[in-house]
């Protein structure tokens, strides 16, 4: 989506999002942990900003809504993912965690419906990881997506823009925009509870409190509908649905053409072979014609014979 103000006005709620999963995109990962932290626009606008060096980490808003869930995946976590997140498929299952299912989608919908609208999801590296993965998980389900009508932005793009605006010349070095690197650059300390969904969401919130007014303006201009996000990879349900629809349309079209009703063009109906001819019984008129001709011939012969007998010399 281009840089333009949304027609419905300002985003009223920012929902900071983080997912933990079984691995990298190439491994077709599944979600193992999810955290959403909903903050009203007013709470961000009223963030108290200190100019100290180093600046203190801003306190999170007092009024927030939070949803944090651990989720049992359908596949094993990669060793690297388990080491970083501290989660494994076996441990999640033994503690009775449930799959990413329709009930979770209903829970997400209820959470979002409680927030002032419009809402915008904010995730770090969201465009490349969190949003496509979340879209993939939702595509597996039979229920409609709870995120229809919700917007989203990637905080990496936002923070790059804010940093470049604050120091256009830069320092000539290439900066890292990982969540931990930005946090350390701003507040001169490492974030706590990294690679837990809730810990990363709180870290992201603290970063976005650095320049809240500029951030909100950027979000208003760059938010895009979550429905435009493409899934990270195809799922059996999604693939089956996608493949079946064209086949169904193709099958219906020739059937409708072959069976064309009177309201449709009759000229398109296949021509049927002409019916076999059945010998017809001779009609009465057909019999009278030869009989009349025979009678005339008989009379003519009798007349000629009578004239012959009556001629002289016979």
Swiss-Prot record:
It is a peripheral membrane protein. One of its GO terms (cellular component) is cytosol. It is an enzyme of class 3 (hydrolase). Substrate binds at residues 20-21, 129, 200. Residues 281-314 are annotated as: Necessary for cytoplasmic retention. Residues 244-314 are annotated as: Interaction with UBQLN1. Belongs to the exonuclease superfamily. TREX family. This is Three-prime repair exonuclease 1. The lineage of its organism: Eukaryota, Metazoa, Chordata, Craniata, Vertebrata.
């Amino acid at each position: 989506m281009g840089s333009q103000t949304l027609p419905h006005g300002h985003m009223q709620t920012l929902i900071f999002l983080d997912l933990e999963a079984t691995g990298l995109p190439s491994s077709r990962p599944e979600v193992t942990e999810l955290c959403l932290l909903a903050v009203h626009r007013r709470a961000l606008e009223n963030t108290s900003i200190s100019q100290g060096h180093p600046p203190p980490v801003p306190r999170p808003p007092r009024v927030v809504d939070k949803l944090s869930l651990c989720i049992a995946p359908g596949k094993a976590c990669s060793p690297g993912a388990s080491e970083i997140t501290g989660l494994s498929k076996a441990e999640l299952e033994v503690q009775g965690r449930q799959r990413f299912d329709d009930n979770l989608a209903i829970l997400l919908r209820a959470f979002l419906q409680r927030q002032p609208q419009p809402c915008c999801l904010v995730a770090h590296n969201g465009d490349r990881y969190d949003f496509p993965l979340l879209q993939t998980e939702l595509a597996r389900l039979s229920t409609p997506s709870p995120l229809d009508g919700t917007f989203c932005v990637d905080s990496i793009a936002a923070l790059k823009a804010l940093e470049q605006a604050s120091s256009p010349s830069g320092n000539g070095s290439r900066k890292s925009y990982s969540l931990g690197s930005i946090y350390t650059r701003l507040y001169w300390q490492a974030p706590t509870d990294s690679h837990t969904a809730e810990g990363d969401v709180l870290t992201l919130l603290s970063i976005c409190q650095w320049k809240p007014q500029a951030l909100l303006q950027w979000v208003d201009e760059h938010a895009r509908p979550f429905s435009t996000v493409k899934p990270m990879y195809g799922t059996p349900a999604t693939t089956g649905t996608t493949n079946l629809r064209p086949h169904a349309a193709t099958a219906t079209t020739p059937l409708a053409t072959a069976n064309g009703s009177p309201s449709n063009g009759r000229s398109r109906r296949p021509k049927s072979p002409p019916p076999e001819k059945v010998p017809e019984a001779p009609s009465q008129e057909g019999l009278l014609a030869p009989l009349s001709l025979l009678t005339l011939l008989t009379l003519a012969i009798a007349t000629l014979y009578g004239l012959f007998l009556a001629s002289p010399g016979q």
